[in-house]
């Protein structure tokens, strides 16, 4: 029989407690016994913390095997204190908060961003799902004429679960889209942003261009799903399901049909994404400059993200109104607009400037908290997903 071994203490880890490095070798020859350093319980009094980690285990013989778990760290900070850090040549104070902090080690930076974006999209969509449900009921005129009446009607007939009806489908759609959007923004923004103290080589802000790229990427990824979703809703009985709809559209109408009407959607999405990310990036820089702190807390990120969402929604809402007017322009009794500029001018002439912002309130009710929660979750996940042990 082979033996298994566990090394219980290893002071070289300097305070790490690890169970996911826990591995074992089993050898047919008892003389080939190789204990694998796995469970560490040595705690440093000056910086006590616990960690769950794993390392790549190599084969220790022809007749041996090993098991390993994912990298998972927890770090406990016993008290509140301040420490100084140097950022771009300036000394800034950073608060260290007590509590238990979870760290997950993922070496690939792209994977860290994608996972953070997916979590951000799923959480933000779930949190605002009740608002989306109430807004949908108001649009179709079911359940009441006000948000309060609709909420009471849903709670009476369906309970809390009624507020989250259809949320799983939205999460499946939004999570990968948000992951790609945030990944593209951060990647492009880092590539285009000049080093500290140097002038930018491009005439427009890097975050504005990166936001536009993020909007284009997100739209290109999700547009076929939106089109199929619309077909399934309107043309009931034609398709058996989502995969059948995809196959029939590609087979009978061609792959380009999946992107029919893409241009108007880009006109609506890209300006919002560009201004949203530009506002978020600018507000974060302004906060750092004002507070003299490099680290931005979760509550501050929530407020900054919400404010960025409000600013971008207000700035681009006239384009959204014009786009919707163009979509219904062929209906009897309505003006047929030549282009978006013509639609904007016509709305201004007939309804005044307030016509550009009709419906802004209900739209912000959903978009503003969703933007804040999404950015907060994204930044929080980036702090949890680390590259190496030193970041713990």
UniProtKB/Swiss-Prot annotation:
Gene3D superfamilies reported in the protein's UniProt record: Mitochondrial carrier domain
Keywords: Chloroplast, Membrane, Mitochondrion, Mitochondrion inner membrane, Plastid, Plastid inner membrane, Repeat, Stress response, Transit peptide, Transmembrane, Transmembrane helix, Transport
Cellular component, GO annotation: chloroplast; chloroplast envelope; chloroplast inner membrane; mitochondrial inner membrane; mitochondrion; plasma membrane; plastid
GO biological process: transmembrane transport
Compartments (UniProt record): Plastid, Chloroplast inner membrane; Mitochondrion inner membrane
Membrane topology field: Multi-pass membrane protein
Disruption phenotype: Impaired growth, flower and silique development, and production of shrunk and sterile seeds.
Domain of life: Eukaryota
Main localisation: plastid
Activity modulation comment: Inhibited by pyridoxal 5-phosphate but not mersalyl.
Database matches in InterPro entries: Mit_carrier, Mitochondrial_sb/sol_carrier, Mt_carrier_dom_sf
Tissues where this protein is expressed: Expressed in root tips, the central cylinder of young roots, and maturating and germinating pollen.
Extent of the Solcar repeats: 108-191, 202-286, 296-384
Annotated TM spans: 113-133, 168-188, 204-224, 263-283, 302-322, 359-379
Role played: Probable mitochondrial adenylate carrier that catalyzes the transport of ATP, ADP and AMP, but not ADP-glucose. Recombinant BT1 shows a unidirectional mode of transport in intact E.coli cells. May function as a plastidial nucleotide uniport carrier required to export newly synthesized adenylates into the cytosol. May be involved in abiotic stress response.
Family: Belongs to the mitochondrial carrier (TC 2.A.29) family.
Other remarks in the entry: The growth retardation observed in plants silencing BT1 is circumvented by adenosine feeding.
Protein's recorded name: Adenine nucleotide transporter BT1, chloroplastic/mitochondrial
The species this protein was found in: Arabidopsis thaliana (Mouse-ear cress)
Name of the gene: BT1
């Amino acid at each position: 029989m082979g033996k298994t071994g566990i090394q219980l203490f290893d002071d070289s880890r300097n305070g790490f407690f690890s169970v996911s490095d826990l591995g074992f070798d089993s050898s047919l020859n008892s003389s080939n016994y190789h204990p694998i350093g796995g469970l560490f319980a040595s705690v440093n009094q000056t910086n006590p913390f616990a960690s769950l980690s794993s390392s790549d285990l190599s084969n220790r013989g022809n007749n041996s095997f090993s098991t390993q778990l994912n990298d998972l760290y927890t770090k406990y900070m016993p008290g509140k204190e301040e420490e100084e850090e140097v950022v771009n040549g300036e000394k800034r104070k950073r608060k260290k908060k007590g509590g238990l902090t979870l760290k997950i080690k993922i070496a690939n930076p792209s994977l860290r961003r994608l996972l953070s974006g997916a979590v951000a999209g799923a959480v933000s969509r779930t949190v605002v799902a009740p608002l989306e449900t109430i807004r949908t009921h108001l649009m179709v005129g079911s359940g009441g004429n006000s948000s309060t009446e609709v909420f009471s009607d849903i709670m009476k007939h369906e309970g809390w679960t009624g507020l989250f009806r259809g949320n799983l489908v939205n999460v499946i759609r939004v999570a990968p889209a948000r992951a790609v959007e945030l990944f593209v923004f951060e990647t492009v923004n880092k590539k285009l942003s000049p080093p500290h103290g140097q002038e930018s080589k491009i005439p427009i802000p890097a975050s504005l261009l990166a936001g536009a790229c993020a909007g284009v990427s997100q739209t290109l990824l999700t547009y076929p799903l939106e089109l199929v979703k619309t077909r399934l809703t309107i043309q009931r009985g034609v398709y058996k399901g989502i995969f059948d709809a995809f196959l029939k559209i590609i087979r009978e109408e061609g792959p380009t049909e999946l992107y029919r009407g893409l241009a108007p959607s880009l006109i609506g999405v890209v300006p919002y994404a560009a201004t949203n990310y530009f506002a978020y990036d600018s507000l974060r820089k302004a906060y750092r400059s004002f507070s003299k702190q490099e680290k931005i807390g979760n509550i501050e990120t929530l407020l900054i993200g919400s404010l960025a969402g409000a600013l971008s929604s207000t700035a681009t809402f006239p384009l959204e109104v014009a786009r919707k007017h163009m979509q219904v322009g062929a209906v009897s009794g309505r003006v047929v607009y030549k282009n978006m500029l013509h639609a904007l001018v016509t709305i201004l002439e007939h309804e005044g400037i307030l016509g550009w912002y009709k419906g802004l309130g209900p739209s912000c009710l959903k978009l503003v908290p969703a933007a804040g929660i999404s950015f907060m979750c994204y930044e929080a996940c980036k702090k949890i997903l680390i590259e190496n042990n030193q970041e713990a």
